[in-house]
């Protein structure tokens, strides 16, 4: 059943259910974090974390992170004079926008940019962006570029001449893209932000995104743990449920402890971001580092306790493990964030 439900969407071009995306808009979920001036509800990191925790429990495929959290945050907090037009289309679900900031061999450093925006009156963009979330479905891209040694964000349409897109499927069945810009013409009114404003917007959007995927991982862990407990109670060996075996009970307790540890760090990060404390970046790095380690442990133990069925397409457990692996590498893995935490 799980396989059939999932395959209905993961093998389509979009990789998610468009009808569910429309429902997200109708329920007001797409408007949650936007300011009231932009037509949103002024919800913050606490509410978004709760939402993403639920996303994690059910392995939601819809591209909320790329559209609302990353691109939405940058647009909503920028001084871009056309932002409300694009935000209203994001909120209604009419348009999708992806952030393109990752480049090859840059070790998660968003300031180290090789994509060049050159010229004065007539601007030309050249370069490549990798690992663009939901790139195949985006109508526009927020692209970080180097313009005269200054970090700049430009808005580029998917139909722009000189832009070629290569699409890929990730280990957890999400969609990412590589964007290649070759002599792409850029007008001055496509510049969203530049200089310190651009760098702060990207930094905060990434921190927001890191919090959200970490909350998603916490939801995944909770679901993994509960499904594993339920499975071990129903599977029998030697005339009794395998949940009666003490060594398996200890392993499930360890899974519970890992999930609760991450949940405590999540609450700390949510509060620091809600109060806009100076420690918000450090708190999120501590959370992300632990989530990467705990998530893989919980996922691997869940698969082991399910036996061979744990890695089958028919059961959700193996898909949780794949999601843990993907989340660990997103926005910096455990070791990257541990180093960032130690240096802050």
Residue ranges of each PLM-predicted region?
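Short glycine/proline-enriched turns and hinge-like loops at secondary-structure junctions
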Residues: 43, 109-111, 134-138
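Short beta-strand-to-turn element immediately C-terminal to the catalytic PLP-Schiff-base lysine
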Residues: 75-79, 143-146, 155-158, 180-182, ...
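Residue-level signal for inorganic ion chemistry
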Residues: 51, 99, 127, 143, ...
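Flexible, small-/acidic-enriched active-site or ligand-binding loops
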Residues: 108, 112-114, 131-132, 157-191
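Alpha-helical interface subdomain recognition
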Residues: 1-59, 78-82, 89, 93-94, ...
């Amino acid at each position: 059943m799980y396989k059939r439900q999932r395959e209905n969407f993961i093998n389509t071009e979009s990789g998610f259910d468009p009808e569910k995306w429309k429902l997200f808009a109708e329920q007001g979920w797409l408007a949650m974090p936007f300011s009231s001036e932009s037509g949103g509800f002024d919800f913050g990191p606490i509410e978004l974390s709760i939402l993403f925790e639920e996303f994690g429990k059910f392995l939601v495929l819809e591209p909320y992170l790329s559209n609302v959290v990353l691109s939405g945050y940058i647009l909503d907090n920028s001084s871009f004079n056309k932002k409300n037009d694009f935000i209203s289309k994001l909120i209604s679900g009419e348009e999708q926008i992806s952030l393109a900031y990752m480049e090859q061999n840059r070790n998660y450093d968003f300031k180290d940019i090789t994509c060049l925006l050159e010229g004065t009156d007539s601007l030309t963009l050249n370069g490549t962006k990798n690992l663009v979330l939901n790139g195949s479905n985006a109508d526009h891209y927020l692209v970080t570029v180097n313009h005269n040694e200054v970090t700049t964000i430009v808005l580029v349409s998917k139909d722009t001449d000189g832009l070629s897109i290569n699409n890929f499927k990730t280990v957890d069945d999400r969609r990412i893209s590589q964007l290649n810009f070759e002599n792409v013409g850029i007008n001055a009114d496509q510049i969203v932000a530049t200089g310190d404003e651009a760098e702060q917007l990207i930094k905060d959007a990434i921190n927001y995104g890191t919090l959200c995927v970490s909350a998603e991982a916490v939801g995944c862990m909770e679901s993994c743990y509960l499904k594993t407990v339920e499975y071990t109670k129903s599977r029998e060996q030697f005339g009794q449920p395998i949940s009666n075996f003490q060594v398996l009970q200890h392993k499930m307790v360890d899974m519970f402890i890992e999930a609760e540890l991450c949940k405590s760090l999540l609450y700390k990060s949510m509060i620091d971001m809600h109060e806009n404390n100076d420690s918000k970046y450090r708190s999120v790095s501590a959370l992300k580092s632990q989530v990467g380690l705990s998530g893989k442990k919980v996922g691997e133990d869940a698969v082991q306790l399910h036996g061979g069925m744990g890695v089958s397409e028919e059961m959700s457990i193996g898909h949780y493990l794949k999601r843990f692996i993907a989340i660990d590498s997103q926005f910096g893995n455990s070791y990257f964030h541990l180093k960032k935490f130690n240096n802050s």
